[in-house]
Amino acid sequence: MAVSLIAYGLGLFLKKKLKWAFLNPLLLSIIFVILFLQVFQIDYETYNETARYLSYLLTPATVCLAIPLYQQLKLLKENLLAVVLVIVSGVIASMGGIFVLALAFGLNHEQYVTLLPKSITTAIGIGVSEELHGITTITVAVIIVTGVLGNVIAELVFKLFRIQEPIAKGLALGTSAHAIGTSKALELGEIEGAMSSLSIAVAGILTVVGASIFANLIP
């Protein structure tokens, strides 16, 4: 567990020191841990015996994201319909995109359902993957890559498409890049963080329901 915490702390230090967008602390910590295990010839099972305790914090950490949402409750009520439509559209676009890619690359059912939960938080994504008989280890990897990518390119995309509305930024990050995207949203502002936090919960619920429907499209 200490290795994971030190690796993440080092990732944060490098991000703050160098201020490069692609130096995501989570991505760096993964690389550091892999290198550590390889150099000292430590097998994953031994490492995971202690590191798994950090996984127990995933769910309460996600629940804590409701705090900024509560602080922006009035704004949410004023834009409720637009918020719901954006999240629903984002979830459909995410799973629809996976369906199209699966057809294009000839993925089988197991590979296809493994990728369906890519845009929701790990705690929910693992459950969806298991329920649909996907490969959970790959699902976790895909979820992390999706979140890191969303975190890294978010500001570039916003500038490219001239997106300035805080609500739109928050919804986009939360719906497409789950908790890792929400960390970027919180950096951008309180409104962005609140909307992104809401998106995680709603997108997770919609994906749980919608994934079973999309899963049947490729037998």
Language model regions located:
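Transmembrane alpha-helices that form the ion-translocation and gating core
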Residues: 85-123, 146-161
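Alpha-helical membrane segments and immediately flanking helix-loop junctions
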Residues: 111-138, 144-146, 160, 164-202
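Entry/N-cap segments of selected transmembrane alpha helices
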Residues: 1-3, 73-98, 140-149, 199-204
